[in-house]
Amino acid sequence: MERIRLKLKAYDHRVLDRTVAAIVEAVKRTGADIRGPVPMPTKIKRYTVLKSPHINKDSREQFEMRIHARMLDIVAATPDTVDSLTKLDLAPEVNVEVRAMGK
């Protein structure tokens, strides 16, 4: 079969690492070869808002969101590997993007 690339994103890195560990364990049980997890750069989104609703522009508050990401490559995936990945119960906070790639 082809190579499968998984990109996982989450706001909490602890939940992301637990999910990656569960995926790696499930893939290794089926006998497929896995590359990764590769930690991707953390994306930081910053927002600045005024504290006051009317005046005083000098008084501001800053917020940020950190998006942590990991990448996994499953090489020589078998049908059992795909079946175990679809049956895996993952955390709802983690966004998983799956792409099947050529050899």
UniProtKB/Swiss-Prot annotation:
UniProt-listed GO biological process terms: translation
SUPFAM superfamilies: Ribosomal protein S10 (SSF54999)
GO cellular component, as recorded: ribonucleoprotein complex; ribosome
Entry GO MF terms: structural constituent of ribosome; tRNA binding
Recorded superkingdom: Bacteria
Database matches in Pfam families: Ribosomal_S10
Keywords on record: Ribonucleoprotein, Ribosomal protein
SMART domains linked to this entry: Ribosomal_S10
Gene3D superfamilies: Ribosomal protein S10 domain
Family under the similarity heading: Belongs to the universal ribosomal protein uS10 family.
Function in brief: Involved in the binding of tRNA to the ribosomes.
Description of how the protein assembles with itself and partners: Part of the 30S ribosomal subunit.
Name the record gives this protein: Small ribosomal subunit protein uS10
Organism of derivation: Campylobacter lari (strain RM2100 / D67 / ATCC BAA-1060)
Gene of this entry: rpsJ
